[in-house]
Amino acid sequence: DDLPIPFRCVSADAVTGERIVHESGSLVSAIRSSISIPLVFSPYPYEDDRLVVDGGVVDNLPIALARSLGADIVIASDVNALQLQSYEELESLSVMAMQTVILVTQEKAAMQHPLADLLFLPDLRDIYSLDFTKSEQIIERGRQAVEAKRDELAALAEKIESSRGLVALDSNRNGAYSLQPTPTILQ
């Protein structure tokens, strides 16, 4: 809450599936908790001896959560995409497990689309969701999605500015990232 705009992220209890909204404490720990993608990163230790995983397991596009926390404008980017095009691609148990997760999270995310003021849908169908070697392509697809909605983005910015004004960028602002403790990562 010390940030100019309150930051929230979501993780899930690895045993109970309880959604955990990180509202205070270490920003580094909150982010590390929320990116603990199952089968990629180990679960992250959370208070009370619990382990947490990526919040996408329970809420991969938390637009409704943002609204419930008081967000009056929500700009979202849905990066859920079905990558498989045929049954032959279900070549292993791990691919089947990932496809199952994608099917569930994609349906949940799509239900929240109407709640966003502006929604970007980058075309990532041909990029495997865990392929971290294609970051440049992913960023470019994101740029294309934003460019496709340039007029809507400009209209939203105009609406915000007319209602309350935009805050000027302060290039001298120093964040508190360097003050955060280093998280312990399970091996």
Label for each model-derived stretch:
Residues 1-187:
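Patatin-like phospholipase
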